Structure formats: structure tokens, C-alpha cells
């Protein structure tokens, strides 16, 4: 028998009880005799017990299905966020490469090849982490979102709408939609 054709002990007992009850009802109907009140009472009890067992079996099946679904979700989350700690350790490396590029003297011809090397290294690192679901949070001129931004200061600005990101002090990152680090930003406010 295949695994789907095999029956659990509860299913076997339920089927046996059902078959017995059906046989008794058929025998009674065929004979057409007046049934002893005790037999009728036992048939009712048997029918009630059979119904309770069916309901119990359905509840058990539903519980097993719920456990299976929860386990699948837990495994999926574990796969999705297994890189979270490792990714958090890479963020300072990305920050340091960006700072090195910001402070490098781009007018010095002797440093141009080194600067290009750092730029390529940073680009390849960002491409590599991007393949695993890490995304940068660092846009300006977007509405302030406390779920991904950390406001460091508020500045008056005529160029920006109120409550919008004016400047990013440190980029934030998400891993598959989950925040690794909020972006540290300056938020605009209306001129008073």
C-alpha cells in the first residue's frame, strides 16, 4: 500500500465502528422487527461516539497541517535571514570603503589608480551583497520613514518639502526587507 492508502488506527477503528453500526441498522430494517429499547439506546450512543471520533480525527488532521505550515515558514525564515549576522559585520567594511573614497584626493594623479581600485572593490562588494538580498537605504528627497530612517537632526529648508530626508549621514541597509541598520539622516522642516 502507498502511504496515502495506509490508514491510521483511528481511521481503522472509525471505519469498523461505522461498518458495524450500518450492518446493525440494515439487519434491523430487513427484519422489520420491533427493536428492544436498550438496543435503540445503544445504537444512538454508538452513533454519537462515531460522530465524536470523526470530529476528533478532523481536529487532529488540522493540527498536523498547521504544524507542518508553521515548520515550513520557520525553515523559510531561517534560510532567508541566515546571513543577517554576517551581513551586519560587512556594513562597517562598506562604510570604510565609502569614507576612503570621500576623503581621497582625487586631484592627485598618483592616487587615481588606487582610487579606481577602491571604487571597483566597493562596487563589486555591493554587487555581491546585493545578490543575497541586501539593499541600501540612502535616498534623499524621500519622505522620512521611521522604520528605515533614524533622524539625527532637523534643518529648515526651502528646497525640501517638510519631513523629507535632506541629507544621509550614514547609509542604512535591509536584508530581504528586514532592517539591518537604519539610515542616519537629516530631516527637513518648514521655515519658520
Swiss-Prot record:
Primary residence: cytoplasm
Superkingdom classification of source: Bacteria
Cellular component aspect of the GO annotation: cytosol
SUPFAM superfamilies given in the database record: Coiled-coil domain of nucleotide exchange factor GrpE, Head domain of nucleotide exchange factor GrpE
InterPro entries in UniProt: GrpE, GrpE_coiled_coil, GrpE_head
Subcellular location: Cytoplasm
Polar residues bias spans: 20-31
Annotated GO MF terms: adenyl-nucleotide exchange factor activity; protein homodimerization activity; protein-folding chaperone binding; unfolded protein binding
Region feature Disordered, mapped onto this chain: 1-34
Chaperone is among the record's keywords: yes
Keyword Chaperone on entry: yes
PROSITE patterns in the record: GRPE
NCBIfam families linked: PRK14139.1, PRK14140.1, PRK14150.1
Chain's role: Participates actively in the response to hyperosmotic and heat shock by preventing the aggregation of stress-denatured proteins, in association with DnaK and GrpE. It is the nucleotide exchange factor for DnaK and may function as a thermosensor. Unfolded proteins bind initially to DnaJ; upon interaction with the DnaJ-bound protein, DnaK hydrolyzes its bound ATP, resulting in the formation of a stable complex. GrpE releases ADP from DnaK; ATP binding to DnaK triggers the release of the substrate protein, thus completing the reaction cycle.
Record note on quaternary structure: Homodimer.
HAMAP family: GrpE
Family named by the database record: Belongs to the GrpE family.
Protein name: Protein GrpE
Natural source organism: Yersinia pestis
